Amino acid sequence: MREAPHVLGIVLAGGEGKRLYPLTADRAKPAVPFGGAYRLIDFVLSNLVNARYLRICVLTQYKSHSLDRHISQNWRLSGLAGEYITPVPAQQRLGPRWYTGSADAIYQSLNLIYDEDPDYIVVFGADHVYRMDPEQMVRFHIDSGAGVTVAGIRVPRADASAFGCIDADDAGTIRDFVEKPLEPPGTPDDPTSTFVSMGNYVFTTKVLIDAIRADADDDHSDHDMGGDIIPRLVADGMAVVYDFSNNEVPGATDRDRAYWRDVGTLDAFYDAHMDLVSVHPVFNLYNKRWPIRGESENLAPAKFVNGGSAQESVVGAGSIISAASVRNSVLSSNVVVEDGAIVEGSVIMPGARVGRDAVVRHAILDKNVVVGPGEMVGVDLDKDRERFAISAGGVVAVGKGVWI
């Protein structure tokens, strides 16, 4: 039995998430609440921790306070055993500047790699919804002998132009890596599907260090992992693709096997929530064998009084539904829905309040939003357009702390 390799986890969590505005007006994209009890970063951290990768650096930058606080309060590991999940903002070790890209974030944090001296480094994104056992991908990488392994998910070729696409040969060696091509390549075994990059990579340590240092010296580079580092290694013949559909997560069902969602737009974020409240959701939050860990607040249970009800909904701890109707919605913790109010097809984040006889439909309410008595959101889009953001799909998004 071979010795387990020494693996360091690096999570790229500096994303601004402009397409999710106003949800990212006051927080980094990985800190956006999701699913009634989580933040987006909880999915990647859960995957790494479940795989027993317990030395993790989270590289942060944009409006990172809520993200830093969430990690420090909810992701404490045993320091006695050398385990840690630590947020790392730009240290400005190489001069008075912030990160200029995801590759530059690693370049400015090379001291963390030198200190840990790992055999391999997993570099994962922080803002996707999925389950994955990264240990299987690391084993695949070691067996392949490649310098970098790129996780790829199969999508219909007709839908692949919105993503970074992978062209691989029959052996899995990546021949080309192209961002948003007009003509996406097929996979070796299926010309109707395309491997799309998940933004998850496994590197042999020396290969990553050499590529990062060379990129830092390139004045023409954008210093981006997907846009610069991976194409550089592809050109050198050092990159292979890992087929995400081969990843077997304990407790997974046929429906949620290889589930992965980029929730970087309001519509994608909303649709992923609506899946959660369906009778048979594609993504199962209740897989106890591969749990997603989230907020650990000590809150009272949700309460329904005076005939209040919730149907096909997720309702977070500490919430109170009083003589109100909630349908097809996700309510986070400490949400109050008052007498006579109606909430339908909506995503309500922690601490929000929907007043007496108010109506909220097809909407996303950020933290601590207050909808006053008799007010309506998502009913008159022309009126809402004057006050709030509205997605291409007609979802009304109300920013943090707004009183209506």
UniProtKB/Swiss-Prot annotation:
Gene Ontology terms for molecular function? ATP binding; glucose-1-phosphate adenylyltransferase activity
Q: Catalyzes what? A: alpha-D-glucose 1-phosphate + ATP + H(+) = ADP-alpha-D-glucose + diphosphate
Keywords, A to Z, come to: ATP-binding, Carbohydrate metabolism, Glycogen biosynthesis, Glycogen metabolism, Nucleotide-binding, Nucleotidyltransferase, Transferase
Say which domain of life the source belongs to. Answer: Bacteria
Which Pfam families would you find in this protein's record?
Answer: Hexapep_GlmU (PF24894), NTP_transferase (PF00483)
Residues at which alpha-D-glucose 1-phosphate binds: Y99, G164, E179, K180, S197
What pathway, per the record?
Capsule biogenesis; capsule polysaccharide biosynthesis; Glycan biosynthesis; glycogen biosynthesis
Q: What class of enzyme is it?
A: transferase
Q: Name one GO biological process term.
A: glycogen biosynthetic process
Q: Give the EC number.
A: 2.7.7.27
Q: What SUPFAM superfamilies does this protein map onto? A: Nucleotide-diphospho-sugar transferases, Trimeric LpxA-like enzymes
The entry's family comment says: Belongs to the bacterial/plant glucose-1-phosphate adenylyltransferase family.
> So what does this one do?
Involved in the biosynthesis of ADP-glucose, a building block, required in the biosynthesis of maltose-1-phosphate (M1P) and in the elongation reactions to produce linear alpha-1,4-glucans. Catalyzes the reaction between ATP and alpha-D-glucose 1-phosphate (G1P) to produce pyrophosphate and ADP-Glc.
What is the official name of this protein in its record?
Glucose-1-phosphate adenylyltransferase
Species, as recorded: Mycobacterium ulcerans (strain Agy99)
- Per the record, the gene is glgC
